[in-house]
Amino acid sequence: YGAMFILLPLSDAGIPETKEEKHKIIETIREEAIRLGMTKEDIVVDGLVATVGANPKAAIECLDTISYCREQGLATICGLSNISFGLPERSCINTAFLTAAITRGLTMAISNPAQEALVDAAYGADLLMNKEGADLRYIQRMNRKSAVEEKSFLRGGEKDRESSPKEKVFDCVITGSKGSIVEE
């Protein structure tokens, strides 16, 4: 996104207790950055995600900050897994929070790309929010997933037959097995 820095809405007093305090800190730092010659496009605001296990209002407060930043034309980022810290089945909470954050204007997230449901939810939320190019990205992702699943299904019924070298290379490309592709 070309950001020059990530704005952490913290003060000498620490983490702000209210969203209003957080928004005031964002505005103060943004004004200083602009005074120093930066543009709002140079700034990415961290939503400062807290765990809902300790603060039941943490998600709403972060989502409100993301909305505030969108209204100000500022990009946003947040560490998704912070929201679910200390809770069971964290991936469910992380996925739900990500989709809510995208609808509020989240620009980017620090997340685990190996969590398929989380990544799929991001593609789906972008599509539903009518983000430019999201329709094609969603279709391409789902087509890739379908191709892998179909190939896996077809392979399951062909255990008695040896795969051709071409089929083995295809499987390696689809599954991302870089080391195996050289062997095949």
Q: Where do the PLM segments sit?
A:
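ATP-dependent carboxylate/acyl-activation modules
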Residues: 1-42, 50-77, 81-184
